[in-house]
Amino acid sequence: MFRRLLIATVVGILAAFAVAGFRHAMLLLEWLFLNNDSGSLVNAATNLSPWRRLLTPALGGLAAGLLLMGWQKFTQQRPHAPTDYMEALQTDGQFDYAASLVKSLASLLVVTSGSAIGREGAMILLAALAASCFAQRFTPRQEWKLWIACGAAAGMAAAYRAPLAGSLFIAEVLFGTMMLASLGPVIISAVVALLVSNLINHSDALLYSVQLSVTVQARDYALIISTGVLAGLCGPLLLTLMNACHREFVSLKLAPPWQLALGGLIVGLLSLFTPAVWGNGYSTVQSFLTAPPLLMIIAGIFLCKLFAVLASSGSGAPGGVFTPTLFIGLAIGMLYGRSLGLWFPDGEEITLLLGLTGMATLLAATTHAPIMSTLMICEMTGEYQLLPGLLIACVIASVISRTLHRDSIYRQHTAKHS
């Protein structure tokens, strides 16, 4: 047991450095090509001329597509093993390392150029790759899946500063591919990754800064639960739209570079209306949580961002949809809160409360992982007072969503690439 805890610690350290490496590579490329050192793609887009804002995501998608197609032609074969940590956990615990690194580099290109796709997916993949590489050298074959799971959880903890949610992500989303008894090493890896990540970044701040002064009362619990019902209905709709957009892009029968370029061009066109569509949505989420906008502003940004996410994910841009889903959930919750705020004197607090609820419940509705989703929002914002209400709402959202749409976003992703 001591040996496993020691290896889990090493995996956590490796994962933290993998995540930090990807993050610093992003910052470097943003500085080189976008003349932006703020770390915010929305700020970068705001400071660009309209024609650069239009073309940059398309050029990034084109470059990523050429890289992926060029690698496949160079090797003259498709990857001989999984390039995704979920697939690796469901098979024999092995990666095609070279193809996975090329995929991560392609993700770096599309993320840095403004596509509305999550950077955290590539971060978690790199963390799992580092764990797998270490495991294949120093551990028996039957443990390889465990250490990939530890690496993925640690990567998630370092990316989102949420070690418990990262651990439960493995238990809930990938349930059946590993035993719950193995959660000990997973949690150790996640916590170590967070601590090392804090040391690297010289900060232990929460991912999102929120000033929620409301004390949750009976009325608020009713609103939280009703938001869970709304998210349970919206989750399957979002998954269906993502699937439909992917099918439409495939039906165009474009070469991968042009398909990714088209997705980027759509994002560029939408960014002419609002630069908030650029990136994974982190900056926009923080601005909404700091000062919730008016109803029509939320609605406008929500629609543009939704189309940008659908275009990016539908075109096959390598990256995650975890953080974009958080923004969509926040916007849905805030739209609901703004509508209700017309009848309540504390409309601002209700909007903020239901925005946080929307983040958790839409995440639960798309991942079918209510406990992880609840802990994720609490850990990212520090608002643990919301935990009881969020847990109930997330369970309701997950049950409704699972009834209407059998597959979660991750099972849908795996089926699409199998």
UniProtKB/Swiss-Prot annotation:
GO MF annotation: an example: voltage-gated chloride channel activity
Membrane topology: Multi-pass membrane protein
Xref: CDD domains: Voltage_gated_ClC (cd00400)
Species of the source: Escherichia coli O17:K52:H18 (strain UMN026 / ExPEC)
UniProt record, GO biological process: response to acidic pH
Full protein name: Voltage-gated ClC-type chloride channel ClcB
Any single GO CC term annotated in Swiss-Prot or TrEMBL for this entry: plasma membrane
Record function comment: Probably acts as an electrical shunt for an outwardly-directed proton pump that is linked to amino acid decarboxylation, as part of the extreme acid resistance (XAR) response.
Family assignment from sequence similarity: Belongs to the chloride channel (TC 2.A.49) family. ClcB subfamily.
